[in-house]
Amino acid sequence: EIRQVKLLTPKGIELYLELEEIMRKKSEVSCAVRKYSGDDPDVTNGILVYATVQKVEKKSKINSENSVDLSEKINLDGGIGIGRVTKPGLEQKIGQAAINKVPRRMICEAVEEVCRKYEYTGNLQVRLSVPEGAEVAKKTFNPRLGIEGGISILGTTGIVEPMSEKALTDTIYLEMKMLKENG
């Protein structure tokens, strides 16, 4: 049984992540990893982030206007505790899960790698969820940015960088952009 996965970050750093709460069903598997924020005072530190991957016969059965096609055969959406975009100005369309492009790309690459390894050519639905996400999100900028119902899945490097002046400046810039977009 797989208890650990290797993840190559966009910075080229290999991480070995312990899997928790592994559940298998006939055509579905889910597991969680615990978020580690290092020295960063991140309110999401220690929470469990779940991924559920489900085999589906026809991709058209899994698409909703709010899900995102990662590839021809892989579809992604957010579940419980993943915020939804409610205002224009972010990377995602209104209604979509607040999962930014770098994490989406990382998820797609990881799922495609497993599909190649096991010679699976069918369609897959990937759903991320964070049971504590709605409560934790209240302590973030998400409500001010128009992200409701949970946390956002962010990142550019795959590693949590300690809070910096640049991170704060980027957050303020994004909030100003949102205010401009929304009058």
Region spans (language model):
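Glycine-rich anion/phosphate-binding loop at the beta-strand->alpha-helix junction
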Residues: 131, 135-136, 142-183
